[in-house]
Amino acid sequence: MRNIKLIIEYDGTAYCGWQLQPNGITIQQVIEESLEKMLGQSVRLQSSGRTDAGVHALGMVAVFKTQKDLPVRAFSDGLNCLLPPDIAIRDASEVPLSFNPRADAISKHYRYTIYNSKRRSPLTRLNSWHLRGILNMELMQLGASHFVGEHDFAAFRASNCVAKTTIRRMFHVSVAKVGDSVIIDVHGSGFLKNMVRVIAGTLVAVGQGKLDPSAIPGLLAGGDRSASGITAPPQGLCLMEVFY
C-alpha cells in the first residue's frame, strides 16, 4: 500500500467548499471522481482541513492510499489531464503510511485580499472583497499586532463552530498595501471556522475608523462574537500553505 500526498490549488468560486456534501459539488468530490477514473478504484481523500464555499487554495494538502505501481509524477500529470480548469495538482509525492495531513500539520498560512478602490474590477471580483472607502493602513497594522500570540478566539469564529477548544496561537498577522489591494496574512497553529474572515472583518472596521485597534485585546478576552467585526466574504480568502 502506498500513501500519495497531493498539494492542490483551486478556485473555489463554483464549489460548495472542499468537503463532500450531499447537496452540492465540492472540490474533494471532483478530485476523488477523477482519481477513481484514473486508477479504476474507489478513493477517499484525507485532507489537512476544509475550506468553505467560495474560498480558494494555493496549497491544500490531501493524501490517498493506493496499490497502483505508478511513478509519483503520473499521479499529478494524470489528474491534471482529468480535472477541470479551476482545480490543479501542484505536486505529488509519496509519504509514509503514517502521515496524517491534518494531525501532522504544524501551522497554516492564510491570506485575505481586499480590493480597495472607488472603481470595481471585474478581474478581481472572484478573489477579493471590494471596498470603496479609504482604509487606514497604520491603524489596521496596529490592530493586527494584537492577534499575535496565544489567545482565546471565541469571539472570532462562526456561531456553529464546534471546536473542542477556541485557544489558538498566531505566529504572524500582517496588513500590507500592494497597489489597490490590501493583503492580510495570517500564520497560525490552527484556525476556527470563519476565524480568518472575522479577523479580516474586524481589521476592516479598524481601518474604517469604526473600531479602535486598542479594543481588540478586550474582544479577545471577552469572547463575545457579536462585539467583533463582520465575517468578511469568502472570495477574498485563500489557503496559501500548510506547514509540517
Curated annotation (Swiss-Prot):
Binding site for substrate: Y110
Active site: D52
Domain of life from the UniProt record: Bacteria
Keywords of the record: Isomerase, tRNA processing
Enzyme Commission (EC) number: 5.4.99.12
Gene Ontology BP, a term: tRNA pseudouridine synthesis
Principal EC category: isomerase
Keyword Ligase: no
Cited InterPro entries: PsdUridine_synth_cat_dom_sf, PsdUridine_synth_TruA, PsdUridine_synth_TruA_a/b_dom, PsdUridine_synth_TruA_C, TruA/RsuA/RluB/E/F_N
Catalysed reaction, written as an equation: uridine(38/39/40) in tRNA = pseudouridine(38/39/40) in tRNA
CDD domains to which the protein is assigned, alphabetical: PseudoU_synth_EcTruA
Molecular function per GO: RNA binding; tRNA pseudouridine(38-40) synthase activity
tRNA processing found in the keyword field: yes
Pfam families, A to Z: PseudoU_synth_1 (PF01416)
Cleavable signal peptide: none
NCBIfam families linked to this entry: hisT_truA (TIGR00071)
Protein's job: Formation of pseudouridine at positions 38, 39 and 40 in the anticodon stem and loop of transfer RNAs.
Quaternary organization: Homodimer.
Protein family membership: Belongs to the tRNA pseudouridine synthase TruA family.
Protein name in UniProt: tRNA pseudouridine synthase A
